Curated annotation (Swiss-Prot):
Protein name: Probable dual-specificity RNA methyltransferase RlmN
Primary location class: cytoplasm
GO MF: 4 iron, 4 sulfur cluster binding; metal ion binding; rRNA (adenine(2503)-C2-)-methyltransferase activity; rRNA binding; tRNA (adenine(37)-C2)-methyltransferase activity; tRNA binding
A cellular-component GO term for this protein: cytoplasm
Intrachain disulfide bonds: C106-C331
More details: Reaction proceeds by a ping-pong mechanism involving intermediate methylation of a conserved cysteine residue.
Function text: Specifically methylates position 2 of adenine 2503 in 23S rRNA and position 2 of adenine 37 in tRNAs.
Top enzyme category: transferase
Keywords assigned by UniProt, alphabetized: 4Fe-4S, Cytoplasm, Disulfide bond, Iron, Iron-sulfur, Metal-binding, Methyltransferase, rRNA processing, S-adenosyl-L-methionine, Transferase, tRNA processing
């Protein structure tokens, strides 16, 4: 039996093309979008302002396509990690992070990752597949706590700019008036920085941008992050200087502080020199140990001194709270054990 195509994850333009192809009236595209993204239905039968004839026509080859998570793990700090199926024998993880008045969902954009960053478990898993816009949006649509969400960060498994077409479609659905109608200020996309995709992302999306930096020294960054060899951080900064981040859109840099590696004042000074002239902020992140990686995280005193030095010299810097470490849901720790099981079987 042929599987049906999901409506979830279709942009308004795609829905308009679909209804035209099926001989439905043009206004049906916005009606379907409203059912999917505003009313968040799970079946075509619920789309009651479409005639029975058109609902039956849609159901011949299409379905909403909502897929609930198949597993969940709960941390002592309230963080919840969800496992979603994304095609045959493929899975991704999303992390729900409640925090007082805010609730953030960290979503994935790929199964695995090609970037092979030294400090990241997803990179150790290798790359398997790009997620479709449907599979990206489903992580939000099918989240049990969906109605509590205030923010989405694309900082889960995968490199978003390596799957730019589907990521941009998902962002269009999240921010478009026909879709979830979220302000772009509620969404942050994190990237190692790919030459091919960075400029296009900045020009086609208004969402916040976070750059994985981790070292201001080219040779050291290349050792930690092979992507540096293709597009250096100095080139990236020069490109970023062509754009205005002084208004509502935020540019931030992510910096894991490693013990004895990049945690001295020398590195803080290099960061200030590298980022001079950019309207940006710095997020310091504690390293979470992963198997087979001989790196250690700096202690909190060192991180605090590092933060204070940057802040007093004009670079607004915060230390990101570490959440979900006990369930392997913290930064750099996402890697689906389920995927590994299937790969071995």
């Amino acid at each position: 039996m042929m599987s049906k195509y999901p409506l979830l994850g279709m942009t308004l333009i795609e829905l308009q093309s679909l209804v035209k192809r099926l001989g439905m009236p043009g206004f049906a595209a916005k009606q379907i979008a409203s059912w999917l993204y505003d009313k968040k239905v799970t079946s075509i039968d619920e789309m009651t302002n479409l005639s029975l004839k058109y609902r039956e026509l849609l159901k011949q080859n299409y379905e909403v396509g909502a897929e609930a998570p198949v597993e969940e793990m709960r941390s002592v700090d309230g963080t919840v990690k969800y496992l979603y199926p994304v095609g045959e024998n493929h899975f991704v993880e999303s992390v729900y992070i409640p925090d007082d008045e805010r609730a953030t969902l960290c979503i994935s954009s790929q199964v695995g990752c090609k970037m092979n960053c030294k400090f990241c478990m997803t990179g150790k898993q290798g790359y398997s597949a790009n997620l479709t816009a449907h599979q990206i949006i489903n992580q939000i649509h099918s989240l049990p706590e969906r109605d509590k969400l205030t923010n989405v960060v694309m900082m889960g498994m995968g490199e978003p700019l390596d799957n730019l077409e589907e990521v941009l479609k998902a962002l269009d659905i999240l921010t478009g008036s026909y879709g979830y109608a979220w302000s772009p200020k509620r969404i942050t996309v994190s990237t190692v920085g790919l030459r091919k995709g960075l400029r296009r992302f900045i020009e086609e999306s208004d969402c916040h941008l976070a750059i994985s930096l981790h070292s201001p020294v080219t040779a050291q960054r290349a050792e930690l992050m092979p992507a540096e060899k293709a597009f250096s951080i100095t080139e990236m900064v020069e490109l970023l200087k062509n754009y205005d981040f002084s208004k509502q859109r935020r540019l931030s840099f992510e910096y894991i502080v490693f013990k004895g590696l990049n945690d001295s004042q020398v590195y803080a000074k290099e960061l200030l020199k590298l980022l001079r002239g950019l309207d940006c902020r710095m997020n310091l992140i504690r390293f979470h140990s992963i198997p087979g990686v001989a790196l250690e995280g700096a202690d909190m005193d060192t991180m605090t001194r590092f933060r204070d030095y940057l802040t007093t010299h004009g670079l607004f810097t915060t230390i990101r709270a570490s959440r979900g470490e006990d369930i392997f849901a913290a930064c750099g720790m996402l890697s689906t054990a389920k995927q590994e099981e299937n790969n071995k079987s």
